[in-house]
Amino acid sequence: MIPLEKPGSGGSSPGATSGSGRAGRGLSGPCRPPPPPQARGLLTEIRAVVRTEPFQDGYSLCPGRELGRGKFAVVRKCIKKDSGKEFAAKFMRKRRKGQDCRMEIIHEIAVLELAQDNPWVINLHEVYETASEMILVLEYAAGGEIFDQCVADREEAFKEKDVQRLMRQILEGVHFLHTRDVVHLDLKPQNILLTSESPLGDIKIVDFGLSRILKNSEELREIMGTPEYVAPEILSYDPISMATDMWSIGVLTYVMLTGISPFLGNDKQETFLNISQMNLSYSEEEFDVLSESAVDFIRTLLVKKPEDRATAEECLKHPWLTQSSIQEPSFRMEKALEEANALQEGHSVPEINSDTDKSETKESIVTEELIVVTSYTLGQCRQSEKEKMEQKAISKRFKFEEPLLQEIPGEFIY
């Protein structure tokens, strides 16, 4: 995802990968150039053999729509010629905005190699390099992004049991990364893929372009991420930690269960204000059909102080993820069931207003396994006019944006 614009002194800047030395004064031989500065939080070594032969010698690109596109990268489906196996080829420009970004691509490759034994992280097959690009040949996830289910009609969207299973997998993957000092920093529905759509497959975590290595002795501050999912400490330019990912998982869980983006405002400034002031609601209609345990799970993560958030390991032990079935419908759901039974018995129930605005904006599916990607956002639910009744009719408007380089307003940096 596009990094939010960084203050001049913060974060890591792309480093040069080569340089030209100058002869030392009074020395008899050429002077070796100093090593390039290492960006903080980035891995610099990979095990993969970087192939330089033409990519088309080994793979055929599939015709049709791209799997995803961003400012500096594009993902296309391809077929390995000698096996017929499907892969996703991620073409990444090495030079962006006049800067050499090869080091950041190397870091992404290194993180994928570090996580190669984890079933919930996308698998890296091999790497190619040309004069202008690096090409990552990745496992193909045929089910696409979980974002598509998040914005689907509620009848077709995730059920709570689905989210329980997928969230266990997400947390197992994130716990694996955290125990290896990797913080993802861009966890969102567009960066969680499915191995199949029907039947619902398993998850694959993708896009490590913003990820960083965090050692206990180091402190890292950077302004980056997708506006709706960034943690409060990102906005206040406080140190990043593993808890920064856990905030994003809280937002992700909220979105998967309800189809609503909890902090989304009318513009980015309002979104940032909602996050910094913790303006969120658990009273939406969608919560009526969720277990109390699910709501409690979200509450353990959407906590302003990073040190008070549940860790990935603690989340995996939460009752919502350890119980075998959904056993805690809310009081309002119980009331709705009582009304349904009363209706079957011939008793009157409050009339439900069915006048809903069903306009939705359809956009092409974008598989955002990219360093820099188009960010789609989930619009807040807009309720229709309601009378005095137990249930309200809801319509959804999903808002889609193509942000440029994000900049957090100055009043949020303090």
From Swiss-Prot:
Post-translational modification: Autophosphorylated.
InterPro entries hit by this protein: DRAK1_STKc, Kinase-like_dom_sf, Prot_kinase_dom, Protein_kinase_ATP_BS, Ser/Thr_kinase_AS
Tissue expression summary: Highly expressed in placenta. Lower levels in heart, lung, skeletal muscle, kidney and pancreas.
EC number: 2.7.11.1
Domain (Protein kinase): residue spans on this chain: 61-321
Protein location: Nucleus
Binding-site positions, ATP: L67, G68, R69, G70, K71, F72, A73, V74, V75, K90
Keyword field: Apoptosis, ATP-binding, Kinase, Nucleotide-binding, Nucleus, Phosphoprotein, Serine/threonine-protein kinase, Transferase
Catalytic reaction annotation: L-seryl-[protein] + ATP = O-phospho-L-seryl-[protein] + ADP + H(+); L-threonyl-[protein] + ATP = O-phospho-L-threonyl-[protein] + ADP + H(+)
Keyword Membrane: no
Expression induction or repression: Directly regulated by p53/TP53: induced following cisplatin treatment in a p53/TP53-dependent manner. p53/TP53 activates expression by directly binding to its regulatory regions.
Gene Ontology BP terms: apoptotic process; intracellular signal transduction; positive regulation of apoptotic process; positive regulation of fibroblast apoptotic process; protein phosphorylation; regulation of reactive oxygen species metabolic process
Descriptive protein name: Serine/threonine-protein kinase 17A
Native source species: Homo sapiens (Human)
